[in-house]
């Protein structure tokens, strides 16, 4: 109550922000008349003037009003479009490390040109990030004439372009691209072997379009570059056959009664677990199939991988549904994005789930993967010096943007008042009643000539509705993952008179639905259109446009509430753009997944009290509130998952920063001779400590053991016993100095033989390859630690603290191994000439060329409690595959030994 009173008196924080920015808008408007008088050359010269002023010490804020006035006038001359005042407000919000919520149709693409130009003046690079290659290419090409008119360069960074093209794209003042591509380039740069192979500059300013989709929806899907692991496809096939014979437990276990069934499903948590009865049954089936020894347990340490296959197969059969979570196309399982309804070719679920689904569908089973490098979007984007984003729906997630990324959300007002009529939800008892009501509503719209966009949550639901509309003889278009090739065309014409379009979730996002149809698309489809043809198309469009407005504008019809209010708001936001007429309504039933899982008891109780009959719907603010509360619960749960993922990844991120900064220093250094000397002393002293403990009696020394170990590890014969016999005054400290000096002498002899320059190059190559090999193994060890850490909770220990402690120990071991392995390789390998270093580099490049990028997608699971945060819910995504090194192949580190006798030992 008090809060509302204070807001009324002083205005909300959002109001105060807009009021302050409004003063700068007034300044920009005051400059407009002067800028209109400038010639094209004078306007273009402003860019050079601004850059000179920045060099002299002025800040971006000092020149912002003039820079925005420059872009506004250039937009009028290049595009014949004048940015509105609200777009100037949006541009200022984006320049100030904030998120701008701008409604659909308010011109976010043009708004982005304002802060992109301003920050592009610094010459440090601006990254404009979109959700897919199509939007990146479209926005770059659309805005290129404006930026080039003002003297700024534009680059496009999409998948499939070469290294030289990428370098050019990143060298541009403004670079358009997708979040995946920017993240992969960062990982790839940190796997490079020379500064020339890196493509990115330091991360300066990121401007993210559809920021909620990238920073929230995809926050659970880390970017991973990986290599192929061992083939275990036969295991997946054998286990897959066993799962259909298991029975679901319908009733939960109580103190008095154990529910019958082999597995239980937690729908809220999207998890499945074997019951005790199920465990016994699976063990029996595995014994019968010869996969488990008689008397052995599925949960014994030796059978961990078998348990992994069983769990993956169980999840594939019970939690993942064809045409909802994935489709099968061309003998491949292709994931469907739960947020957009689009297919994601090339992406794969992690932890064996994708292979289990492939086994279930009887298609070719691809190999599992081993992580080579990874980063979450959260940690990638937090590295930018400046970060901003825009979307039509951010306010519901404002807390998360602030808590995770430190970004405030500012709701930018619309240019024209919103007149869309958002009607209350209608709730039916059964799905069949709901669909009957939807068909009736669609028929009514068609009779009025009002276009309808029907939003569904899955491909399966969109196809069911399509068949119902077909039976009702209602012409319609279907927009889902199976027909995405026609996406832009279908969306462009979804606003025609009486058009009926079924769209899965937010398919078509980024393309406006124009009332009356899109006349520009019609003109583009003509070859060399005449002025008369263009005039006729525009005149016809105006007639259709007026008819659609008269019929009530675009009607949005939601067939189910999404678990996030934001996704529902995105669907509604397709209607009512730029002050157009429009309406929206959601049709729900008690059989919908959100209602069944989260809101069923309370709403069912209300419906029964009201004595509802078949075909009758309930429409009441209480029901809408109960549904919204259910959505809030799910949003809070999903926020906790993302927060926990980040807390665990922060541990790995600290280590990643250390390793990557070390790599960059190594690559940029002309010589690492001093580093080699330092670690050489550490390694030799550590080795001597094992055989000659410090301040110990000579009787406790194991001199023969030390001589033998030195020969094994470093290929050097040291006559330590002879030294001790001949020189009575040789004590522990002087002996250590003698051993270090002997190694240095042997190494200097090698340097004299091959030349200092060749050896310096070889040292760098060995250090980099060894670091990369150990980092890869460390990531695998971290994965294993993460998957089992939740069990520490049973020992009354905090899993997060244990993870931090043990991961630090693993990291320390990795650094110790790095020192030892580098000195060992440098001691043993005989470098004859520069050609040996070149051969080593060539082998590395061949290995690199084998790595084909592939994506992997995390199964969208919720974590039901703290202990599960580190269990089998770890999303591992977007993977690049490479061939596995055979045990008898030469080790990639260049030591000349077989892999099994070198780095293979470590794994």
UniProtKB/Swiss-Prot annotation:
EC number(s) from the headed UniProt entry: 7.4.2.8
Positions contributing to ATP binding: 87, 105-109, 512
Cofactor(s) demanded: Zn(2+)
Any GO MF annotation of the entry: protein-exporting ATPase activity
Region (Disordered): 834-907
Assembly with partners or alone: Monomer and homodimer. Part of the essential Sec protein translocation apparatus which comprises SecA, SecYEG and auxiliary proteins SecDF-YajC and YidC.
Full protein name: Protein translocase subunit SecA
Organism: Shewanella denitrificans (strain OS217 / ATCC BAA-1090 / DSM 15013)
């Amino acid at each position: 109550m008090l809060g509302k009173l204070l807001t009324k008196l002083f205005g909300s924080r959002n109001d105060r922000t807009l009021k302050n920015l409004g003063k700068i808008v007034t300044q920009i408007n005051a400059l407009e008349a002067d800028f209109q008088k400038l010639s094209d050359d004078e306007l273009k010269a402003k860019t050079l003037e601004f850059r000179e002023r920045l060099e002299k010490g002025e800040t971006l804020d000092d020149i912002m009003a003039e820079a925005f006035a420059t872009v506004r006038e250039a937009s009028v001359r290049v595009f014949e479009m004048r940015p509105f005042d609200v777009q100037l407000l949006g541009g200022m919000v984006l320049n100030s490390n904030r998120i701008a919520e701008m409604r659909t149709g308010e011109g976010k693409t043009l708004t982005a040109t304002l802060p992109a130009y301003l920050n592009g003046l610094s010459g440090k690079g601006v990254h404009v990030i979109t959700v897919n290659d199509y939007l990146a290419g479209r926005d770059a090409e659309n805005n290129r004439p404006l930026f080039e008119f003002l003297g700024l360069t534009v680059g496009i960074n999409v998948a499939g372009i070469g290294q030289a093209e990428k370098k050019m794209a990143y060298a541009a003042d403004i670079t358009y691209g997708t979040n995946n591509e920017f993240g992969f380039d960062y990982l790839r740069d940190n796997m490079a072997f020379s500064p020339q192979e890196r493509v990115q500059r330091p991360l300066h300013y990121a401007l993210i379009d559809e920021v909620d989709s990238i920073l929230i929806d995809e926050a659970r899907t880390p970017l991973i570059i990986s290599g192929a692991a061992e083939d275990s496809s036969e295991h997946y096939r054998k286990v897959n056959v066993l799962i259909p014979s298991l029975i679901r437990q319908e009733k939960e276990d109580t103190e008095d009664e154990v529910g019958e069934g082999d597995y239980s499903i937690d729908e809220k948590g999207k998890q499945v677990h074997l019951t005790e009865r199920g465990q016994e049954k699976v063990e029996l089936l595995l014994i019968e199939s010869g996969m488990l020894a008689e008397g052995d347990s599925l949960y014994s340490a030796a059978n961990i991988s078998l348990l992994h296959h069983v769990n993956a197969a169980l999840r594939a059969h019970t939690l993942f549904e064809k045409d909802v979570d994935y489709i099968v196309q061309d003998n491949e399982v292709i994931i469907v994005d739960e947020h957009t309804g689009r297919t994601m070719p090339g992406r794969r679920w992690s932890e064996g789930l994708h292979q289990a689904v492939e086994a279930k569908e009887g298609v070719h089973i691809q190999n599992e993967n081993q992580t080579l490098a990874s980063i979450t979007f959260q940690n990638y984007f937090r590295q930018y010096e400046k970060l901003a984003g825009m979307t039509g729906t951010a306010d519901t997630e404002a807390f998360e943007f602030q808590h995770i990324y430190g970004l405030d959300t500012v709701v930018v007002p619309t240019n024209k008042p919103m007149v869309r009529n958002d009607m209350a939800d209608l709730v039916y008892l059964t799905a069949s009643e709901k669909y009957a009501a939807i068909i009736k509503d669609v028929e009514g719209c068609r009779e009025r000539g009002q276009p309808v966009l029907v939003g569904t949550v899955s491909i399966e639901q969109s196809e069911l509705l399509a068949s119902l509309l077909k039976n009702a003889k209602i012409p319609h278009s279907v927009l889902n993952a199976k027909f995405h090739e026609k996406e832009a065309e279908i969306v462009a014409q979804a606003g025609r008179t009486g058009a009926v379009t079924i769209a899965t979730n937010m398919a078509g996002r980024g393309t406006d639905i124009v009332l009356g149809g899109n006349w520009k698309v019609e003109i583009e489809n003509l070859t060399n259109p005449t002025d008369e043809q263009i005039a006729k198309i525009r005149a016809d469009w105006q007639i259709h446009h007026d008819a659609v407005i008269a019929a009530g504008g675009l009607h949005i019809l939601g067939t189910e509430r999404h678990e996030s209010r934001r996704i529902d708001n995105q669907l509604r936001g397709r209607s009512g753009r730029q002050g157009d007429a429009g309406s929206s309504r959601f049709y729900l039933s008690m059989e919908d997944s959100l209602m069944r899982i989260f809101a069923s008891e309370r709403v069912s109780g209300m419906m029964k009290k009201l004595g509802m009959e078949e075909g009758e719907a309930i429409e009441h603010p209480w029901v809408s509130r109960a549904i919204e509360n259910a959505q809030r619960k799910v949003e809070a749960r999903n926020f906790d998952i993302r927060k926990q993922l980040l807390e665990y990844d922060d541990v790995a991120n600290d280590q990643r920063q250390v390793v990557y900064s070390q790599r960059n220093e190594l690559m940029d250094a002309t010589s690492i001779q001093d580093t080699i000397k330092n670690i050489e002393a550490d390694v030799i002293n550590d080795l001597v400590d094992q055989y000659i403990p410090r301040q110990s009696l000579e009787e406790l020394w194991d001199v023969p053991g030390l001589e033998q170990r030195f020969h094994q590890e470093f290929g050097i014969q040291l006559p330590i016993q002879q030294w001790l016999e001949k020189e009575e005054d040789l004590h522990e400290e002087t002996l250590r100095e003698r051993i270090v000096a002997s190694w240095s002498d042997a190494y200097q002899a090698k340097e004299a033989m091959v030349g200092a320059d060749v050896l310096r190059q070889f040292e760098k190559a060995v250090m980099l390859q060894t670091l990369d090999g150990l980092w890869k193994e460390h990531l695998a060890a971290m994965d294993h630690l993460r998957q089992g850490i939740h069990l520490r909770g049973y020992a009354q220990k905090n899993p997060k603290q244990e993870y931090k402690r043990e991961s630090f120990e693993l990291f320390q071991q990795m650094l110790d191994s790095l020192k030892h392995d580098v000195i060992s390789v440098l001691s043993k390998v005989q470098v004859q000439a520069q050609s040996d270093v070149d051969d080593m580099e060539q082998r590395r490049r061949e290995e690199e060329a084998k790595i084909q990028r592939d994506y992997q997608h995390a199964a969208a699971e919720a974590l039901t409690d703290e202990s599960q945060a580190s269990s089998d819910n770890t999303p591992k995504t977007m993977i690049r595959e490479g061939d596995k090194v055979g045990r008898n192949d030469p080790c990639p580190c260049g030591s000349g030994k077989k892999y099994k006798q070198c780095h293979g030992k470590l794994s």
